[in-house]
UniProtKB/Swiss-Prot annotation:
Catalytic activity: 3-hydroxyanthranilate + O2 = (2Z,4Z)-2-amino-3-carboxymuconate 6-semialdehyde
Chain positions recorded as O2 binding sites: R50
Keywords noted in UniProt: Cytoplasm, Dioxygenase, Iron, Metal-binding, Oxidoreductase, Pyridine nucleotide biosynthesis
Localisation: Cytoplasm
Molecular-function GO term, any one: 3-hydroxyanthranilate 3,4-dioxygenase activity
Binding site for a divalent metal cation: C131, C136, C170, C173
Organism: Aspergillus niger (strain ATCC MYA-4892 / CBS 513.88 / FGSC A1513)
Entry protein name: 3-hydroxyanthranilate 3,4-dioxygenase
Amino acid sequence: MLPPALNIPKWLETNSHLLQPPVNNYCVYHPSSPATQGYTVMIVGGPNARTDYHINTTPEFFYQYKGSMLLRTVDESSTPPTFQDIPIHEGSLFLLPANTPHCPVRFKDTVGVVMEQPRKEGAVDAMRWYCRNKDCGKVVWEKRFVCTDLGTQVKQVVEEFAGDEEKRTCKACGVVARSKYEEGEVVQP
């Protein structure tokens, strides 16, 4: 028998406490469940506390349920890479192509839904931090891993980066990267 449809407002009434920094996500449909056929569906709240750019080998589907968010992306096909901010407003959808470095910036009192396709066995995700010095923009640190539990692994990598100043220091220019944006540093669209 199939489960009932998930009612987002009711789910948020009883479960919003599960949306905790740094990622603020909760997997409502986990890839380990046979019913999901490997898909991951997350409810994600704001504000989040992360500056990483996630690189996923599959496309990611974003639906902004409440408020607006900013999806920071990097186009690596140009030299130097081009940074582009994509606002996703309430009620809007966005499909991010596979292997696109992206940093989802979520603001206070916002809620979105993110769906990821099943990864191929052994597929490697990455989390990358770029230098915040606009004249540099080099990769400060990157961690690659086989993603088996998005709900816990992303948080662990963010915390690993946050807790190690050497990892946060740009080898090219010496600027220390932040693990989360300061209040007001990124303007909500």
